[in-house]
């Protein structure tokens, strides 16, 4: 029997059997049994109902030690401070979403001030901090209020400038823009997949670096989502993956308010969320009253006690709690107005000024989140110092992994006369990079044999083998890319993922978010053209190149042979603040003359002269990928007729666009207007390089089902046609 005394309360753990115990307490000589919140174990949670007007008490059993947790009026004042700061910021901006902050503030407060191990003084520099993602990014005013109260570099003045030009408080959270924000969110559902990626990274790094007595990677990933997030397909893909992977340190707090922008969720969302997530392999916990701080805390403890399953805590809330129109879509996405705010503040019994933070709330955050975070980080620093002494090589590798420095690798060159698909030369590069960059890992959306993404002699990332470097994302392209974003945001690894290029459409929203967040993810997109052949137009990319090239801050590289593929991978792995998309062939490509010597420098400038004209320059043929060989053959045919042309390989338009005016003029002189671009994709975007006087040999229709070489012939990708097209200039 274990006894814990706190004031006039005495708590006793009674062991009824070796496997079972129950908690009782004596209050004025009356015995009251605590309700079991999940079954007694080494880590369990119990709570009892209110007794004699006392607030409900929570007992937490951790390693059979009993801890007391309770909440008081200051905690409730802190919750209301989060609400009022959010309301005031939205009103000042005359723009924003008050419903979520007003309804979800209790769960967010309990999580932040009573559970999360974060240190505002060091912000995102402490690698073992807990992570929090606001997947429902429209609730950003709540996040900013929490960040301010927690002590991050976010002032009341910043809250007053919510959604204004140049402010630290944009409409949706942006990483690297606002101190303490872990991920850029807003497009619903993606934040959940980001959280899955972060939990994957935590599990992988823990398996790789932790040693007995040295759990240097040991943190939780929390995300807050709403009904809309769960309607999005990407959240379902990600939840399925997380359940399979048994990511026990992943916890979703579900703001279940039954309201969407259009009205009640009953109009479109009536499924059994509990049943769905349990089918995925998750633990589901229901909190019936979203204003009950004790019940929320008990649920979070129960979530942390489950180590074999991710947990979704469904918290039943009232959207816009306290507002005159609470519980309706009217409070979802528009300011309440002065009268509406006054009504809500009266409901909260709020007696302070606009944007005011009561001193006792500031003190409560100092005693809670700040003190706990500083203590936790100092304990981790001490642990890591001992780890460095015991495992110096691993410690150095850990520090290097989190430094996010450009990786430099050496790749074996491809010799003239050899031939292989660029997806195969990419696989060789992946293998060599994995041997030189220990933090490098990745996989494919169920196409590893086709994308050639698997690293040989490495284990698979699976439950019980989280050290594995081959990730099986399954047929979940969107979740793959969004989880990759979470992995990259977590830090400590370099991740890549592959699929067919035609399926890039499935994952572009996540690629966009990677580019927006400056994440150095790598996308291996194979089967890049009509050369796919027999599978037909559903699997033959046409518009994809033009689409991805239009995306800011994304390196799109379509290499012409093995040497350009090597150069592309070197560039990709050296990036620290930009994603890269490698567009690779299914069919074999011969190694071209000159690429061994010119490709690396040329690719890093986006375009280069691969073969100069043999006489006075008549014109220029520009090509990418598999069509560079056709350009070279066309040059030879034209040369036989006394027409001297230059062949420019342009593996990356966007990198070329970033070069100096002098370099671009040296490659594409303005005076040379006879230009032909050859690419097995859309003509869209090529006018920029060929000009009004130029022409393109491209494809502005759908592909066909036939052997790839036959399709190329039918679409005019022949030396004869290219020669005549050039001569028509």
Swiss-Prot record:
GO cellular component, one term: cytosol
Highest taxon in the source lineage: Bacteria
Residues the record marks as active site: 477 (proton donor)
Binding site for Mg(2+): 227, 257, 259
Cofactor (UniProt): Mg(2+); Ca(2+); Mn(2+); Co(2+)
Protein name: Transketolase
Calcium as UniProt keyword: yes
Subunit note: Homodimer.
Binding site for substrate: 97, 332, 423, 450, 527, 535, 586
InterPro entries: THDP-binding, Transketo_C/PFOR_II, Transketolase-like_C_2, Transketolase-like_Pyr-bd, Transketolase_bac-like, Transketolase_BS, Transketolase_CS, Transketolase_fam
